Each structure stands twice: as structure tokens, then as C-alpha cells.
């Protein structure tokens, strides 16, 4: 295939697509240039159906540091495991693509996005999403696309598509919306307490922009697209299906309608085990035994799926007996743990999350060094989902993509209400431990996080709560569900998570299993979510009405002082020698920013005060008219040098030592003496003159005796060679050394 180039303008930037030049052995490949961001996307499909009961789709987003003209960090100087941002971007692309493959498609598909050049003002993730859809669409892989995605901002009351870096920093909204030309099928958002109306407007305008990109893709597919391959889809034997439904459907229906989760799971498993045993015995010697038993398992899954959906759409009954807009029982607890800086335990039905707060000096912030310029991340929200939370065994180790994604969602939801660095100069870490799960654990972690922050004395603007909405749709009719549980999530069509305060939304996330949802469904889901959010906030506020006024006793205390920027090097010292010495002596932690803000942390207030005194002394400057208790450190004929504080010395001229005339400095002071002095002058070079006599009472003028004669005083003959007329010193002499 010869190279072909397609070009358009989108959101004020050039969008160029190249095909037929690189990665030609892949089923489909494109180079997407958006602004100066360049992404290569290659899509590949396996030749045969994979084993397993799921569609093995893998989407990767690879950040090459050369794309931004940077070296990778670390000893190896080579890209390693994907960054958190790369993992989240891969999930962002996967989610709108996955619903676009046929039911029963089991061939393995890999979509690899490689960032070759990076322009921070032209979204590489959106170029990668565009490229992923297009590479699949022009390939022979049976992909029912195209899809596209855009980023949406909200600045000065205006909706902005694919905002620049500067606009993004000013925006009250960070939204990614993706979909087909007919409907939205993926949403990811953080927002600064925006209303449902503004969020809906942003979603709909984002979808209008998505349609533009899809039209451009369709033009390219028409020009270079391949014919789709014929692949085998997983299907079950129709006669076997009819036989099992006739014999066991009523038993499975009864089991599904058991309200309590564990009892329901046990009841359905009894039916499944019974059916499996019957057919294992019946077909034990059959040459296609494995295929038949796979079909039996799939048929039972389909029967359970159908019954759950029938109950909700026809009978308006949910598996646990709730109404469609009813929340499960709620419980909130603070101070679940001693010693930690804050903790909250939130329970919703059989979903339970424990959130633990840790506060630390700003030196503990996470340094993010990716394609964007390096920056420090002050707030971290980590989410852990152990297998015991669902009563199962399983893998333990590093967090997977799902845990990283759920942690990031909670982080976005809570970050919007955190105090500024000036108000609260701490690094903040929340860890959510999911202790039980029956759906919506990510939203439980947000509620638990709010409890932990408030209990820990972090002055958040307002409590945040989260709720997960679901959808059951048969094409003509639909039902929106509030607070979905695991079964409704598994067999439903939508998982729409909404978090926020009483004033507005702080985070959204939507994934669907159908090809899209309408504005009508979005509107209804947002309205139901708002009502539910307020109910949850009532419970949180009843548990802890307001943020505690003080931090936990175990949390590090902080004091901040401001120093001149040119004094920073004095506090740090050569090679960090001075600051390390202060830390060693006092046991505190110290952070200094480039603006001269010095933050001192410790759980011991006395240690903070001591460190503060030392630093204040290091950067202290003498001032005219200030009085100091000084130590004599050097004596010269013309006066004495005294140490005012730390490394700051002053000269007390001999004429400023006493009101009476003195010939020898040693007659008044010795090295090591401590004397009170007053600063009387600081010259342009910073040299300091001080006075002892300025702090002494001035003696009265000499008076005549009764005979009218003057009182005796030392007399020096005028003919003496070195005689000089006495003069009053009104200012001190300069250092004559």
C-alpha cells in the first residue's frame, strides 16, 4: 500500500493522518500528527480464537522520553514499566473501544500506541485514541467503529474543546468524552463543583466535536480501509440451550431472587453445580466434551443475565428487593484506627471501605517526571482491592490497572476540595482499603476519604460523596438504577459514577457495554445521582458535622517562616551542611521553596521552636537602633569587635565605649566579656558600628566650686607634641585595618 496523507483542522490545530508507510505488517497502522504531537498506532489480531470466557483486548500507551527531548530517569536510562499517567491513558482508550466488538468475539487484539513526539499544547492521548479507532477501522479486524474522543474544558463560562496547557490550568473542568457518531460511550472527568447542567452541556458539546472526528475517520476508511475478516464467534449449541432453559430456568430464577448477596451466590451455585454434574455424566465419553461443558457454563451465565434484566425491566424488582432509586443501608465511622493521622470507615450495604490519612512535610511530595515538565504532586489517593473483599483467593502484588484507575478517580473527586498549599502546607496521602465489595467500591472509598480528611483536621472546603448509577436497556425501554450492586454492574449496561459536594460535581466516570447512551439517559442519571449524593452527605455530616479544628496528636506540626531569597543558601549551607546540622540537632524536617518559604515539621513543638530560632538567627540582620547582648571577640587599639549574633560582628569604637575619655580599650573590656550595645550605623558595605555608651546615662556637665573655680580635671600641657584638641565623636570611626 502506498503512503497516503489526510489532513484537516480540529480545535485550532492541524490534524494529519498518514497510512501505508510504517508498520505495514500490522493488521492496521496509522501515524497521527496533532499539532506537534506524533503518535504511531498499530493494531494486530491473532489468527485463532483464544481460550477463555472473555475478550482478550490489550491497549497500550507507550511514552517514549525522546518524544519530549528527555532522558529516562534511573540507572538504566531506559523506559521501564508504564507511568501512572500512561496506564490511565491506556484505560481511557480501551474503555470506548471495547464495546465496539461483537458479542462472542474471542480473538486476541492488541492496540499499541507509541508517542514519537510530544507537544504539551496538542493532546497526545486524544491523538492516540483517534489513532486506535482509525487503525482498527482501516484494518481487517472486525471492529464496529469508528469512535473518537476529545478533552473538554470550562474557562470563563465557555466550553473549550481540546484546551491548551494554559487554558487547562485555568479550567474548572477536566473532561474526556468519547463515543460513536450516534451516542456517548465513555466519560472521565474532574470538576470544581460544577452543576449538573454545566456538566451535561459539556458532555453534549464534547459529543458534537466527537462527530467531527468520526466523519474525518470515515473519509479515511472509505479511501484505504480493508475488507473485514470472517472470524469465528463464540456461540452455544441452540438445542442444548433450549434443553437447559426448559429444565432449569425456574430453579435459577428462584435463586437469583434471593436478596442477600452471599445467600444468592450460594443458591445460584447450587443450581449451576447441579446442571454441570448432569451434563458431565451425560457427555463424559463424548469427543467434544470440553466444548459442550463450555457451552453449559455459557448458557447458565446467559440465563442468569436474562433473569436479572427481566426482573428490573418487567417486574421493576432488583435482586436485593430495593426500588430503582433506593440506596443500600449506610454507615459511617471516624477514628476507626489509633495513632494514624485520620481514618474513616464507610459502609454501604455489603460494600465497605477503610480510608487512612497520612500527612507529611512537602519534601515527601511525589516527583512526576514524564513527557510533561517535571512537577511535584502533593495529594495522592491509593486504592487497594484485596481478593478477600469478595470472599475469594487471587493474585497479590503490585496494583493493577483497575486499582490505579479507581485510585485516580477518587483522587480527582477529593482534590477539588483540598485547601491550598498556603493554607495547609502538607503532603497528603489517602489509602483506601476495600474490606468488602458488592459493587461501587470506588465510590465508597471517596466517602471514606472524606471522613478521614475531616477527622484528621484537613480543612477541606466541603464533604464529598460518590454514588454509582446503572442502566438496564432493551433498546426500546430503559431503567436507571441508583447505587448498583455487583450483580447489576455485571449484567447491566452502564456503570456511571458521580461524586461531588452539595454545591456541585467533582468527578464523573462512565463505562458502558452497549454502543452509547442518549442525552435523556444522562440527564435522568445525573438527577438521580444528585438526590442520592445528598442522602449520603446527610449521613457523613451526621457522623462528623465539620472538620476538626486541630490535627491528630501524632500528625506532624508545622511552622513556616519567610526568608529573603538570597538567604536560602545561608540556611542550606555548602552541600546542605547547615540544614543537615539543624535537622540532626533538632530532629525536625525542613522544606525550603524557591520563594524563601521555610516549613518546619515535627510532632514536637519544642523542636520546631528550636529549629525556628536557629534559622532566624542564620538569616537575622542587624538594624539601626536595635540593642543586642554582644560578646567581645577581638580587641584593637581603636576599639573592640563584638559578635551581635551568629556570624554578625560590629565595631565598638573606643570613643563609643564610655562617656569619659579612655586611652586603652583593655581598661573597659576584655575578650569574652558580654556587653550591651546599640547599633548606630550600617554603611553601604554592610559594616556595622555599635555603641556601648549610647545605653549609659550621660554624665552631667562639670559645675564650679564654692570659690568660683572650675573643678579639677586631667590637664595636658599644650606644648606636648602629640596633643590634639578634644573633640566630641558624633559618629564612629571606620575600621582602620
From Swiss-Prot:
Gene3D superfamilies in alphabetical order: GHMP Kinase, N-terminal domain, K Homology domain, type 1, Nucleic acid-binding proteins
Keywords (A to Z) from UniProt: Cytoplasm, Magnesium, Metal-binding, Nucleotidyltransferase, RNA-binding, Transferase
Binding site for Mg(2+): 489, 495
Pfam families: KH_1, PNPase, RNase_PH, RNase_PH_C, S1
Region named Disordered: 691-737
Enzyme Commission number: 2.7.7.8
Protein name, entry field: Polyribonucleotide nucleotidyltransferase
